[in-house]
């Protein structure tokens, strides 16, 4: 009888754990996709390598636009997140235009740095919690 009770308690704990895991904030796939492109363009630019940014500027812009069009998760401040995503899209549009205009690497580095800072505002300050997700670089 003790073993049955122990098994039932263990099953109950597993069920509660499973429900808790499911109620945690789901990842925002569009943010993760943008972050992957941002990391692949910003970090080389920090080191003076603008080639990845020049090659992927349009892709970065498209990812920002896709992210902007996606549903904002409940664990983000909706108004602040929307406004900051709008800014991020404007920044990536400008980056794409400046790449096409063949501006200096110094100017492009400044633009991608600003866009990177905007990304981190969304990832950190726009959250309803104190967490800062997705900055494993």
Regions found by a protein language model. Give the residues of each.
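Charged, amphipathic alpha-helical oligomerization/scaffolding segments
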Residues: 33, 37-40, 52-55, 59-62, ...
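Immediate post-signal-peptide N-terminus of mature secreted/exported proteins
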Residues: 22-58, 128-134
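Short, structured helix-loop boundary elements
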Residues: 28-31, 50, 57, 78, ...
């Amino acid at each position: 009888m003790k073993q049955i009770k122990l098994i039932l308690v263990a099953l109950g704990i597993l069920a509660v754990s499973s429900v808790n895991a499911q109620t945690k904030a789901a990842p925002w796939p569009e943010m993760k996709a943008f972050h992957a492109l941002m990391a692949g363009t910003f970090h080389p630019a920090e080191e003076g390598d603008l080639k990845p940014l020049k090659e992927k500027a349009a892709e970065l812009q498209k990812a920002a636009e896709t992210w902007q069009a996606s549903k904002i998760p409940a664990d983000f401040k909706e108004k602040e997140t929307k406004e900051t995503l709008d800014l991020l899209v404007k920044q990536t549009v400008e980056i794409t235009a400046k790449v096409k205009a063949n501006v200096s690497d110094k100017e492009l580095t400044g633009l991608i740095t600003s866009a990177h800072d905007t990304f981190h505002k969304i990832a950190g300050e726009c959250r309803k919690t104190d967490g800062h997700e997705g900055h494993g670089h």
